A protein has these predicted regions:
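Cofactor-cradling patches in redox/metallo enzymes
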Residues: 251
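Flexible phosphate-sensing "switch/lid" loops adjacent to ATP/NTP-binding sites
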Residues: 1-225, 229, 234-248
Length: 251
């Protein structure tokens, strides 16, 4: 945008968040689909509703949803906290999150409820009612043993069909997800292990997320990879003895 302004594309006008920045955001989203002829373009707005950093992006999404009508659908991921001391699930944070999103001019079409505990139908209906969302468009994403089980869980709740309905598209036969389910079965039924030592600089596990997931996936063909999380700091002269247990291929 700075280059465009200096080039004179804005004819000397003062650059503003609306419409200049929001138009640029929309242009990039549309360009991705037009350039590669995608059927669907998924755009994620990270952060928390109400953050000042995300305001221009939310406004751009609001405009796109208004301009595209049935060709756009908004899915809001929100959190249902579990109070262990009281043994209670709280829906208020979700209600306030959706209310804040609505104040930005965006009515979510679908809600995905992130939760540690399974949500019963009563909670699902309560959220649907207070958030003005169809009950069949409220799905839960509870903690699972593996993140790779999430797509199967989402399909079982009809998330894919809900998206198609909101886009006014025909709902065909339910995919079997055969290759995906086979992948999960191989992981669960692995009989051998390969131990791999990973030496890194940071303690934060997400810093090496791509490496960990690559090993996870590779370990299903046909064995399971057992990754050892090691710190970099102790790795100094004479400090390699602790890594003697790390091995590959059983050696």
């Amino acid at each position: 945008m700075i280059d465009k302004e200096r080039h004179g594309d804005y004819l000397g006008k003062t650059i503003q968040v609306v419409p200049h920045i929001t138009n640029e955001i929309k242009r990039n989203v549309k360009y991705l689909g037009e350039k590669y002829h995608y059927d669907f373009v998924i755009t994620e707005i990270g952060g928390t509703i109400g953050d000042i950093e995300s305001a221009p992006f939310l406004e751009a999404i609001r405009q796109m949803k208004w301009e595209m009508g049935k060709n756009a659908v908004s899915i809001h991921l929100t959190y249902i906290p579990y109070l262990k001391a009281a043994g209670e699930l709280k829906t208020k944070p979700t209600q306030h999150s959706v209310k804040e999103l609505q104040s930005q001019g965006i009515q979510p079409d679908i809600l995905v409820l992130r939760t540690e505990k399974h949500l019963d139908e009563g909670i699902m209906r309560k959220v649907a009612s207070f958030c003005n969302v169809d009950i069949d468009c409220v799905v839960q994403s509870e903690d699972l043993p593996s993140i790779y089980e999430v797509p199967v869980n989402m399909q079982a709740q009809g998330l894919d069909a809900a998206i198609l309905r909101k886009l006014d598209m025909p709902v065909g036969e339910t995919p079997t997800l055969g290759p995906w389910r086979s992948f999960l079965e191989r992981r669960k039924n692995a009989t051998e292990e390969v131990h791999i030592g990973l030496v890194g600089k940071y303690d934060l596990q997400d810093a090496y997320k791509s490496i960990r997931e690559s090993l996870y996936q590779a370990g299903t063909y046909p064995d399971r990879a057992d990754r050892a999380a090691d710190e970099r700091d102790p790795l100094r002269p004479g400090g390699s003895a602790g890594y003697a247990g790390a091995r590959a291929g059983g050696h």
